[in-house]
Amino acid sequence: MTNTRKTHPLIKIINHSFIDLPAPSNISAWWNFGSLLGLCLAIQILTGLFLAMHYTSDTTTAFSSVTHICRDVNYGWLIRYMHANGASMFFICLFLHVGRGLYYGSYTYFETWNIGVVLLFVVMATAFMGYVLPWGQMSFWGATVITNLLSAIPYIGTTLVEWIWGGFSVDKATLTRFFAFHFVLPFIVAALVMVHLLFLHETGSNNPSGLISDSDKIPFHPYYTIKDXLGVLLLIMALMILVLFSPDLLGDPDNYTPANPLNTPPHIKPEWYFLFAYAILRSIPNKLGGVLALVFSILILMLFPLLHVSKQRSMMFRPLSQCVFWFLVADLLTLTWIGGQPVEHPFIIIGQLASMLYFTIMLLMLPTVSLIENKLLKW
């Protein structure tokens, strides 16, 4: 008798993706973040769905509808804070997942990597629009500042911004369309995830050594399903500790004040996971230059397959590249800190130096150090 798992047209797709999938025998815990991102997406879609049942996307009632969810809906506070902090967990996993890809040379899987960068952009857009929905002060002013950046585009900028706003300022039309997009984008993300996995399974997973592992594969189930289950346990534990003990730790107190177009908050800043990009944006005095730097700070990831000049794929056996990689991590943490600081001395110059270093490390230092290591191999 044939196994249904291997013959059923639908179940066999799942079987080839999650059960009988040949996986390298030596992949470490850094390979857990793919499944954790899938879990984060599922949590966000489910909690978001329940929030959408009670939320109203109207400027007069949006803020009070969120208050109503927290006060009157059964476990509404839990759903709301799981959704808000779930986004933070999502981005922590995203950054670690991308960092893993950079460290171990996973970007040489060209299609998988580029789809991943597109996914990063779409998730960032989704998170930005979600931040606008509670219609607090930071929601309103964040939306105003970020959408206004598009006015830097020559010729069509102003028209484009007013088209996105649906008027001459961020108002009811903006909130309604942001809610619509925020609702639909996670499903587009889910579809892109399928494409991401499709391309990954064309080549198989990379591994810490960066060497071809075709001769040493093990089935995904039970080895990596049990390993993923541990990651899931730790992620849910971290999320619930955050949600139940300090749900507002990563939020902005200004967002508990209803949006007021006549009163600007002293420091407009996005959520913590956008601060590095915000710092890069602010470090350039020119508006268009800042916008280009902001976009390029993420888009630069697409250049990594082209900038890879090392004879080895992974950084596992490249101590010089490892040093530069950790410089980059430290620089990103510095940028994140600067993004949350006011625009004054000495933060301005620190931000400018950190932004310059960010692009220098990626475009110049990593390839140069790789070439030096290639030379050292011959000695």
UniProtKB/Swiss-Prot annotation:
Heme b b562 binds at H83, H182. It is a multi-pass membrane protein. Heme b b566 binds at H97, H196. GO terms for cellular component: mitochondrial inner membrane; respiratory chain complex III. GO terms for molecular function: metal ion binding; ubiquinol-cytochrome-c reductase activity. Changing T257M: In strain: Isolate S41. Component of the ubiquinol-cytochrome c reductase complex (complex III or cytochrome b-c1 complex) that is part of the mitochondrial respiratory chain. The b-c1 complex mediates electron transfer from ubiquinol to cytochrome c. Contributes to the generation of a proton gradient across the mitochondrial membrane that is then used for ATP synthesis. This is Cytochrome b.
